[in-house]
Amino acid sequence: MPISAETADTRVVARDAVVNTKIDRTTAKTREVHDIASRNATTRLLVETANDPIVVAVLFAGGKGAMNISRNGKIGWGNGNFLVRSRPYFLERGITTAIIDAPTDQKYDLRHGFRGSANHATDIGAAITHLRSTYNLPVWLIGTSRGTNSVVNAAVRLAADSADGIVLTSSMLTWNEKGDNLLGFDLEKISGPVLISHHRNDESRVTPPEGVRNLQSRLTNGGPMKVAWYRGGYAMGNPCHAAHYHGFNGIEEQVVSDIVAWIKQTKP
């Protein structure tokens, strides 16, 4: 389901955020580019608003995580990512989406330690605060693959700026040479709702299904928690890429539908 912008204008909605608004005549009500000041850097968000939204979901792609979002909202990298390509399914169900890009001082690659850093959590906290105040809605973080490192890092480190809940899809569950895995974080500090979504046949060596049990056992101090398992779909190409079971290829709508149902069930 393509997203096509028809008209555009630019406005300032907050002291630290410039927004470029584009009216969408398909799924999204509006399409906006927000530049959020944090530390000595800026983090860009591509926000697509739903009709009568109930939540804002910040989407964290995997891999290098540098989306290269342009000023007019074009995504330069990662269009095939599970969460990025599934935006219409969220929008149809009343979830406003915000794709988060890499900050300007780390704009080429979030791997090799940045996803687990205090600076990254600070940037995410600034985005949460901005979105919550701009839209007056709960804010959830949803990550896939390496994006789950970013989500968990924020959930562990943030207090007042924390999200209302998190969703972890195709979670990073083993040591790897390019970054963190979730079991290395202080998971016991997570206090909000958590949904874990995983494919039974995920063949990526860094997101093994058998690791979910260890993740689940560490999430002991939070709110509601659920593990959702999936089968089916299609497996194409690299097992660690988005066209394989790792990216829920062919069953995207079902996975998103379940995520939204969980959010509605647990949101304040």
Set out the residue ranges of the language-model regions.
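N-terminal cap/lid segment of alpha/beta-hydrolase-fold proteins
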Residues: 9-52
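Short, surface-exposed "cap/lid" segments of acyl-processing enzymes
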Residues: 50-92
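Alpha/beta-hydrolase active-site loop
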Residues: 82, 86, 108-134
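Conserved alpha/beta-hydrolase
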Residues: 87-107
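Primarily recognizes the serine-hydrolase "nucleophile elbow" in alpha/beta-hydrolase
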Residues: 129-189
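The feature captures the conserved acid-bearing segment of alpha/beta-hydrolase catalytic domains
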Residues: 165-230
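C-terminal catalytic histidine-bearing segment of alpha/beta-hydrolase fold enzymes
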Residues: 222-268
